[in-house]
Design a protein with these regions (language model features):
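Short, conserved micro-motifs composed of acidic
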Residues: 1-26
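Non-catalytic, peripheral interaction segments enriched in hydrophobic/basic residues
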Residues: 1-6, 28-149
């Protein structure tokens, strides 16, 4: 497959690989990351947002059935939902991820029993957390060092 940015059909261009014609596409999903011809990762972030919500619903039902400390709930979130939210962020982490950050902030606002209008700074400060953007930056730096070394 070949990425093609323009809508114009190129009739005379035909690319072959092992005597097979390669298709022109606007987006392609590789290992769960949607690669787009225009370079944005909105579809990736949207699908990760939806998948993380699917992982969050069973977690919330466990919280309703069993009384857990906040630290245990955070540990469960970090082990079950956070990997989904940050999947492939070494590649797409340069872009803003508003939907992904919203899952994180909504979880902690619900966990701390504060209103949705509460400042995110206060919400992150109470449990000693950072926005997911910081975690994505750390993952990108670690990945870069891994590639270099």
């Amino acid at each position: 497959m070949v990425f093609k940015k323009h809508n114009r059909r190129t009739e005379n261009v035909e690319l072959l690989y092992n005597n097979q014609v390669l298709n022109f596409v606007k987006c392609f999903t590789y290992l769960g990351v949607n690669l787009s011809s225009n370079g944005n990762f909105h579809q990736t972030q949207k699908s990760l947002h939806e998948q993380s919500l699917k992982g969050l619903f069973p977690l919330n039902s466990v919280f309703d059935m069993v009384s857990l400390d906040i630290s245990d709930k955070v540990r469960l979130f970090d082990s079950m939902v956070l990997p989904i939210l940050c999947y492939g962020s070494e590649v797409w982490g340069f872009h803003k991820a508003v939907d992904i950050e919203r899952v994180h902030t909504n979880f902690f606002k619900q966990l701390l029993s504060v209103k949705q209008q509460t400042s995110n700074v206060c919400m992150y400060g109470e449990p000693g957390r950072f926005p997911l953007y910081v975690y994505r930056q750390i993952r990108k730096i670690k990945y870069w060092f891994k590639l270099k070394g």
